[in-house]
Design a protein with these regions (language model features):
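Short, small-residue-biased leader/transition segments that mark boundaries at the very start
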Residues: 1-3
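Short, hydrophobic/amphipathic alpha-helical patches that form generic packing surfaces
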Residues: 10-17, 32-40, 120-128
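Long, charge-rich alpha-helical interaction segments
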Residues: 114-152
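Charged interaction scaffolds used for protein-protein
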Residues: 20-89, 136-198
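Structured interface patches
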Residues: 6-21, 79
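Generalized protein targeting/export and membrane-interface segments
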Residues: 74-75, 83-118
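Alpha-helix initiation and N-capping motif
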Residues: 5-9, 28-31, 97, 115, ...
Length: 198
């Protein structure tokens, strides 16, 4: 979801009446799914788009997608529990919309690199640290202590953490198209809220 303004969250905050639900704390895939379904109830269950045929990368064709067919896809290999070594593991939580915006758009600290921001997101998404039989809530540690923990991970351990993020659930829908010029069939995958409003 590549939006800086609060239009989506403003709509959700006005529509979600359940006490205790903080829209800013919801994972981005939940926000996208909720917004898409609110949009469906508001202006219609179908979305008309123009997509590019994958066989030639040029021909554009109109398609209609029905919102109730769009799902949040959770890959089978995705797991919130990450085994770091024989004794230590992490339980992760999904980044909230606020964390997503801060890591992708926050420019307050110009000196902070992409790597720094990535480490900060990982540190913020740690929920529980397990060491043998002991468990610690990450929130009981300072932001700097969590960041130090992330920075001391070796490359193999960090790849496991990266897998958590790369396989996170996401709004996704695959449509089949036929190129009217070549008659070739192809699949187009739409992912994330922006693809459904292109």
């Amino acid at each position: 979801m590549c939006i800086r303004d609060s239009a989506v969250t403003d709509v959700l905050k006005k529509c979600i009446l359940t006490r205790g639900i903080k829209v800013d704390d919801l994972p981005t895939f939940d926000i996208e799914y909720l917004f898409l379904n609110i949009r469906a109830k508001s202006i219609g269950e179908d979305i008309k788009l123009t997509v590019t045929c994958p066989d030639d990368g040029e021909t554009k064709v109109p398609v209609t997608i029905y919102v109730d067919e769009i799902k949040v896809i959770r890959p089978k290999e995705h797991n919130i529990d990450i085994v770091l070594d024989d004794k230590m593991s992490l339980r992760m939580k999904y980044p909230s919309l606020n964390q997503f915006i801060e890591s992708n758009f926050d420019t307050e600290d110009e000196a902070e690199t992409i790597v720094d921001k990535t480490f900060r997101v990982v540190a913020d998404c740690m929920d529980t640290i397990f060491d043998g039989e002991d468990a610690w809530e990450a929130k009981d540690y300072s932001a700097q202590e969590r960041l130090d923990f992330v920075q001391q991970l070796n490359s193999q351990q960090y790849k496991k953490v990266e897998k958590f993020f790369s396989t996170m659930p996401k709004l996704s829908h695959t449509i089949e198209v036929v190129n009217p010029n070549t008659k070739e069939k192809g699949s187009v995958v739409l992912e994330g809220l922006a693809d459904f409003f292109a």
